[in-house]
């Protein structure tokens, strides 16, 4: 796991990204959650701009602040495509309102990532998984 953390820390340094995590709430995060989890507000700030979003910590990591690796590994790193492609790729029903909300959230995340990072930096981000 140490290698993963080092990779994420190196990415932040190489891209001049400030990483900030702040506790936000203890609640249900995903629509299908059966257990509550810690929710944090995460800010990624680069020379191109900043992006603040909520991050639901893994239930198995309760009491631990998310690390850069925890967050960066979960980010959308590729263009999403259209709704039908998204549903086909991830097994969603195209008639599902939940799928549509999820799709819109993923598109918004991708738009923010591609706004604050260059194409070259996104290629580096894609290596964190």
Language-model features, listed with the residues they occupy:
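Acidic, low-complexity, intrinsically disordered interaction modules
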Residues: 23-125
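Short intrinsically disordered terminal tails
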Residues: 1-2, 121-129
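Negatively charged, low-complexity tracts enriched in Asp/Glu with abundant Ser/Thr
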Residues: 2-27
């Amino acid at each position: 796991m140490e290698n993963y953390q080092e990779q994420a820390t190196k990415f932040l340094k190489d891209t001049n990204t400030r990483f900030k995590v702040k506790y936000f709430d203890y609640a249900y995060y995903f629509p299908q959650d059966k257990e509550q989890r810690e929710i944090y507000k995460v800010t990624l700030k680069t020379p191109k701009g900043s992006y603040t979003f909520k991050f639901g910590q893994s239930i198995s990591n309760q009491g631990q602040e998310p690390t850069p690796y925890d967050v960066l590994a979960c980010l959308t790193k590729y263009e999403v495509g259209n709704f039908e492609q998204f549903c086909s790729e991830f097994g969603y029903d195209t008639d599902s309102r939940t799928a549509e909300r999820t799709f819109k959230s993923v598109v918004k995340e991708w738009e923010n990532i591609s706004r604050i990072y260059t194409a070259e930096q996104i290629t580096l981000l894609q290596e964190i998984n």
